[in-house]
């Protein structure tokens, strides 16, 4: 490496001797709050092994925790609703609702897991949120990584946090796609309170970045507005115009206005469901179960434990998924939880469709049950095969299959 064997890099410079390192090598981001400081992969693995051994001695696992829709819901703008927290970053207003039982879960789980926050929000946003849910720093310390330090990508990877050996790491997130359906993932039902908008949705952020990249004209107009503001001598007028420009830029992010009143009924329904949310209580119990199984096992591998639990959900059931909006999510999720998707030679057990006419046609064709996609979601979030009675769209099973099902249920 150009005559320098030191393990630390600051950009293209050695962090110890200052020598410029021209040739590239396999480096690892050493810190959470920046991706500019790196160490060699060998050094990272050595540090990681030492840390993992210390955690094993403490009988602790690692929990990588998402924020948005996992433990809270954030919207732009203000709200008069009780139990919400408001703050401002760069003149954009945010309103946050914490998921019920969050503090209980953190108190219980922090005794068994070292918790790391991994969010697609910005560094400023994440730090403000953490101040709200962990003001003393006892749960997260400085273990926070955001999209600002995520090496320019809008997906999450355990390799960004840990260079080696992920067998003792559990992920808690509402988005399996962001993790590319990683085997360490525990999926939680998304938490919605104000509306159904995820302000830090990676797909939305990607579209925004692509849009901004091609808006040179809009950028020029923005700069022009700023220049006019700077030319005005009256500070009160300048401040007001500045606010107008910022409101305009924040508007594309989803700042809500009086038009929200047209959605009051839907929002009220979402809040009614959210107020009775008990998902974090269930998750706390499940994470304790995983912890117990891990330290009782000789192999000690979280992925193996989670894989076994997940595959019991659909346990070899055969599915045909219709062409619907969220088909990719359904197919990958069904397979991840032990189902078989396609048209196996042995037949089909379930057709999944939200269209009644299509479900009727396919169920007749395959002589099987047709269920709504909601059944798949509820099974996955419950980590068990829930009774499908209320999710059935139509039933075209043969008599023999129907009698076998009755026998299974009542014997």
UniProtKB/Swiss-Prot annotation:
Cofactor(s) the protein requires to work: Mg(2+); Mn(2+); Co(2+)
EC number: 3.1.3.16
Alphabetized SMART domains for the sequence: CPDc (SM00577)
Gene Ontology CC entries for this record: nucleus
Chief localisation class: nucleus
Catalytic activity: O-phospho-L-seryl-[protein] + H2O = L-seryl-[protein] + phosphate; O-phospho-L-threonyl-[protein] + H2O = L-threonyl-[protein] + phosphate
GO MF annotation terms: metal ion binding; RNA polymerase II CTD heptapeptide repeat phosphatase activity
Catalytic residues of the enzyme: 66, 68
Keyword Manganese: yes
Domain BRCT: 309-393
All copies of domain FCP1 homology, residue ranges: 56-212
Subcellular location: Nucleus
Superkingdom of source: Eukaryota
Keywords, sorted A to Z: Cobalt, Hydrolase, Magnesium, Manganese, Metal-binding, Nucleus, Protein phosphatase
Function field: Processively dephosphorylates 'Ser-2' and 'Ser-5' of the heptad repeats YSPTSPS in the C-terminal domain of the largest RNA polymerase II subunit (RPB1). This promotes the activity of RNA polymerase II.
Complex and partners: Monomer.
Alphabetical list of PANTHER family matching this protein: RNA POLYMERASE II CTD PHOSPHATASE (PTHR23081), RNA POLYMERASE II SUBUNIT A C-TERMINAL DOMAIN PHOSPHATASE (PTHR23081:SF36)
Protein name: RNA polymerase II subunit A C-terminal domain phosphatase
Gene source species: Encephalitozoon cuniculi (strain GB-M1)
Taxonomic lineage: Eukaryota, Fungi, Fungi incertae sedis, Microsporidia, Unikaryonidae
